[in-house]
Amino acid sequence: MSQIILASQSPRRKELLEQIGLEFEICPAKGEEVITKTIPEEVVMELSKQKAEEVAAMVSSYSEAHREITTPSDILVIGADTVVAYDGKILGKPKDEADAKAMLTMLSGNTHSVFTGVTLVLIDKSGRAGELVFYEKTDVKMHEMSEEEIDRYIATGEPMDKAGSYGIQGKCAIYIEKIDGDYNNVVGLPITRIYQELKKIGIDIYMW
């Protein structure tokens, strides 16, 4: 018996895993994020690792304390973090509507990059069996947005829980001119890359 755990409460990441037909549990990391890096790809890998390792530690501790209970023989913990980067600035989730407006004004008519860091922690009966850490990058070109369009979009509430203040899969789709790279990476989880990275080390998540 094996188990997949998503160390995130993001509804978008949940939907992406459901979309490809995986069975999994959700156990979001609750620790405070500590950022020591400044380069976008290093930041997202650092944060994804913190999330995955926090949940992996909880799972390992539980399994150790409840050996008499049947627990999964193999566990895969998936941690992820996404940021938008433009002109040397890292854009996370907006603090408020003014922050969202500043971000969208910055991105309007320009090309930015979306980075998602992923950490995969493998746990077996003996404990931690391995860890993979990587990132995926997608470039996104946005159409020009007028101030009225930006205000109208912010009024929907959609930008407020999203890196860069927009959701490519939502109402902001009409302002996306083109993308270069993995669409799902912009949504929040590069599921193709995850599958391929696991496949390289002999793991088929559909046989997990």
Regions found by a protein language model. Name each.
Residues 2-5, 18, 40-208:
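Anionic-ligand binding patches
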Residues 20-22:
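Short, structured coil segments at secondary-structure junctions
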Residues 12-14:
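Short, glycine/polar-rich helix-capping loops at beta-to-alpha or helix-loop-helix junctions
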Residues 6-10:
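Glycine-rich beta-to-alpha transition loops that act as phosphate-gripper elements at the mouths
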Residues 35-39:
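Short, charged, surface-exposed secondary-structure boundary motifs
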Residues 24-25, 177:
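A short, local hydrophobic-aromatic micro-motif
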Residues 25-33:
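A short beta-strand-loop structural module common to alpha/beta enzyme folds
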